[in-house]
Regions:
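Active-site metal-coordination/substrate-binding segment of hydrolases
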Residues: 70-136, 156, 365
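A non-catalytic alpha/beta surface segment that caps or lines the substrate-entry region
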Residues: 20-23, 29-71, 91-93
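N-terminal capping segment at the start of a domain
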Residues: 1-35, 348-352
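Acidic, glycine-rich active-site loops and adjacent beta-strand->loop/helix elements
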Residues: 80-82, 98, 135-143, 166-170, ...
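Active-site nucleophile and cofactor-binding loops and adjacent substrate-binding regions
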Residues: 53-55, 103-107, 322-325
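Acidic-glycine-rich active-site phosphate/pyrophosphate-binding loop
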Residues: 80-95, 160, 176-187, 341-342
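Acidic/histidine-rich catalytic neighborhood of metal-dependent amide-processing enzymes
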Residues: 108-179, 253
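Metal-dependent amide/peptide-bond hydrolase catalytic core
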Residues: 1-5, 185, 189, 193-200, ...
Length: 380
């Protein structure tokens, strides 16, 4: 249970959370280009009592608290990147009830809440039951391919006992399993030519369209409790209206929360590409994203972690958690056999759109949940 001092701290520091959100929203951070946000977070952590802070090669801001060479570790993480490619500040506005900006909830508000929550324990130099890593991580979105989370698991590996990531828009939702995915950039090349003089030559756009049509004939595997999907998200190519296209490309993906179904999709996609090669079409396939499904996590330990989140939601909000699968930074530890969940410390809507927003009156509740989960690892 949160102490009176913790509740007072939350009430007194909501404006700090809002200030961090405003500051971060003014700093563009597409995946792989989070340098400026990372520097902001590093400076903030150091100015607020965190002594062991660094930016690693993956652009993660890693704050180590009472970490020794041997003790077990628990990770608390929220990502700095946004799904948007913009390299100039995006529009931001707020009123008494909401803030509006691309990326304001996913994951800026979650990150701000995590930062201020962690500060409570660190500034008071409270004794931890294990080593703690507070991480503002890179590359969660899109073709970031979970680079930041991968680096943390690579660097700390089997020492990590449990792993939390803050992401999402619903304080009751607990992501309990991983949705894996494979993402491809597929490029088709043909002879092309002048639209009149070379009429009859193969058109790369037509060939790519035919591949897409074949993909969309796929009947996804059916399995109880499993959802499998596919999507073509971007297509581009051609030269001009009077040119038979020599080159066209697409970005496509498939997803599933089941490893066997993910493998079924892989085989179908690869057979499709090979079939068009057999027809004399040049098809280049580049794997640009590989997010694993869950691995062999000790079920009892994962259940205990989920139960801890369920208990916090019940205690704070008098409600039951909503469990489900998703693709988050938790994919990587789960694939490595580490108990991991994703929870939200903010409430909003419109994620991945330019109309994204957060509810300001829910920031205290997000901070309560975040601090309640962290509290378990301190001797209070």
């Amino acid at each position: 249970m949160l102490t009176k001092e913790m509740l007072s701290y939350i009430a007194e520091n909501i404006e700090d959370i809002k200030r961090i959100i405003r500051d971060l929203c003014a700093i563009p951070a597409p995946s792989h280009h989070e340098e400026k946000r990372a520097e902001y977070c590093k400076a903030w952590f150091r100015a607020n009592g965190f002594e062991d802070v660094e930016i690693d090669e993956a652009l993660n801001v890693v704050c180590r608290y009472q970490v020794t060479d041997e003790n077990d570790l628990v990770v608390f993480m929220a990502h700095t990147d946004t799904v948007f490619p913009d390299t100039e500040p995006m529009p931001f506005r707020e009123d008494e009830k909401k803030m509006y900006a691309p990326g304001v909830c996913d994951d800026t508000a979650n990150l701000a809440v995590m930062m201020v929550s962690a500060r409570y324990f660190v500034q008071r130099k409270l004794r931890a039951k294990c080593g703690l890593l507070f991480v503002a991580n890179s590359c969660e979105e899109g073709l970031g391919n979970l680079k930041g989370s991968r680096r943390i698991v690579q660097d700390y590996g089997s020492r990590i006992r449990e792993f939390y990531t803050f992401d999402g828009t619903n304080l009751r939702r607990v992501v309990t399993s991983a949705v894996g995915s494979h993402r491809y950039r597929v490029t088709v090349r043909t002879e092309g030519g002048h639209s009149y003089g070379a009429f009859g030559n193969r058109n790369a756009i037509y060939c790519l369209s035919s591949i897409i049509n074949t993909i969309y004939t796929m009947k996804v595997p059916q399995k109880e409790g499993v959802k499998t999907t596919y999507n073509v998200g971007v297509i581009e190519g051609g030269t001009s209206v009077n040119t038979i296209a020599q080159e066209a490309s697409m970005l496509c993906e498939y997803r599933s929360n089941d490893r066997e179904c993910l493998e079924t999709m892989r085989v179908f996609f690869e057979k499709t590409f090979e079939a068009y090669r057999a027809m004399g079409v040049e098809v280049e396939v580049e794997l640009v994203g590989d997010r694993p499904c869950g691995g062999d996590v000790p079920q009892e330990k994962l259940d205990a972690l989920i139960a801890r989140a369920d208990s916090a939601v019940r205690e704070l909000f008098d409600a039951e958690s909503i469990h489900g699968p998703s693709s988050t930074d938790a994919n990587i530890p789960l694939a490595a056999g580490i108990p991991a969940i994703c929870v939200s410390a903010a409430v909003g809507r419109g994620c991945h759109t330019r109309q994204e927003e957060i509810d300001l009156d829910q920031l205290p509740n997000g901070a309560k949940l975040s601090m309640r989960l962290m509290q378990e690892y301190f001797e209070i």
